[in-house]
């Protein structure tokens, strides 16, 4: 029989709520707790209505129940400012932390590029970069796996309505973390990230533009093949991930244009930026659970 790993979601906002709905369908992860700090939080109320245990008194209140409820995975959907303390407390109790903030104190995780490596090493904190990073870094990695990328620039355009207060408070961290991961995981020598929050009504679907500048003339056939294969890999956990145009070659520049449609679990389908983040985080937790079930890794003993 499959053994689900039991999980807590910290942060009952847009991301936390969408993650909870996705987790309810998972074969590998069982959501048990949601932690917030606002007694009037809509997210906590929704979680309670779904049969999830909740507290509005923060992580310290939840920790008292962690061992008894056998919580093994935590998803932090709060803010970069508080993540480090959350992670320190939970890692000390043998909980694997999946960080959906731009704090990036653990290694970056882009599932089709490097998730297996993290799961096999039992990394206790993995960072999901940003929505822009999840949508674009697979494409940079697809190009850099064929030829050296001197410079990569990504532009993530998201609807204003899909961007909650947590993301707005972390815009600088968003651009820095994404650019850093474009280099470290995407394989570009230099990376740059731009986020555009579009207030248009009706809201636009998430759009992502990826420009890669190569150090030599492009191998068009193999780059195209690599990009198409990577799109299929991402579609395994984000079905609405689509190549709109490209790769387009202009001298040594390669341009790729993507859109991301969400599943519409919590926010409407235009919020692909929310979906790709939560789907990638859940895929990451599921890979850890699969490795535990197959005895490839052993979770920390805490009894």
Curated annotation (Swiss-Prot):
Tagged with keyword NAD: yes
GO biological process: catabolic process
SMART domains, alphabetized: Semialdhyde_dh
Keyword terms: Aromatic hydrocarbons catabolism, NAD, Oxidoreductase
EC number: 1.2.1.10
Broad class of enzyme this protein falls into: oxidoreductase
Molecular function GO terms recorded: acetaldehyde dehydrogenase (acetylating) activity; NAD binding
CDD domains (UniProt xref): ALDH_C (cd23933)
SUPFAM superfamilies: Glyceraldehyde-3-phosphate dehydrogenase-like, C-terminal domain (SSF55347), NAD(P)-binding Rossmann-fold domains (SSF51735)
One of the Pfam families matching this protein, by short name: AcetDehyd-dimer
Similarity annotation: Belongs to the acetaldehyde dehydrogenase family.
Name the record gives this protein: Acetaldehyde dehydrogenase
Species name: Marinomonas sp. (strain MWYL1)
């Amino acid at each position: 029989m499959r053994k689900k790993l039991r999980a807590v979601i910290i942060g009952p906002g847009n991301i936390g709520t969408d993650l909870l709905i996705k987790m309810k369908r998972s074969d590998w992860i069982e959501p048990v707790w949601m932690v917030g700090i606002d007694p009037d939080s809509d997210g906590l109320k929704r979680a309670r209505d779904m049969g999830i245990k909740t507290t509005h008194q923060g992580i310290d209140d939840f920790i008292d129940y962690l061992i008894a409820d056998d919580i093994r995975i935590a998803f932090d959907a709060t803010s970069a400012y508080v993540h480090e303390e959350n992670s320190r407390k939970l890692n000390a109790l043998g909980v694997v932390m999946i960080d959906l903030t731009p704090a990036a104190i653990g290694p970056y995780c882009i599932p089709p590029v490097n998730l297996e490596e993290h799961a096999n090493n039992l990394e206790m904190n993995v960072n999901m970069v940003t929505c822009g990073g999840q949508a674009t870094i697979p494409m940079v990695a697809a190009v850099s796996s064929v030829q050296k990328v001197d410079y990569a620039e990504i532009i993530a355009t998201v609807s204003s309505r899909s961007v909650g207060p947590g993301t707005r408070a972390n815009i600088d961290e968003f651009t820095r973390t994404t650019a850093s991961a474009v280099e470290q995981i995407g394989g570009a020598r230099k990376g740059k990230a731009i986020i555009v929050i579009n207030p248009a009504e009706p809201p636009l679907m998430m759009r992502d533009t990826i420009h890669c500048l190569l150090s030599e003339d492009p191998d068009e056939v193999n780059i195209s093949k690599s990009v198409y294969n990577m799109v299929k890999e991402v579609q395994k956990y984000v079905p609405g991930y689509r190549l709109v145009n490209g790769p387009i070659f202009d001298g040594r520049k390669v341009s790729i244009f993507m859109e991301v449609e969400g599943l519409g679990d919590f926010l409407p389908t235009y919020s692909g930026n929310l979906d790709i983040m939560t789907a990638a985080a859940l895929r990451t937790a599921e890979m850890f659970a699969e490795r535990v079930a197959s005895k490839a890794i052993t979770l920390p003993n805490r009894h």
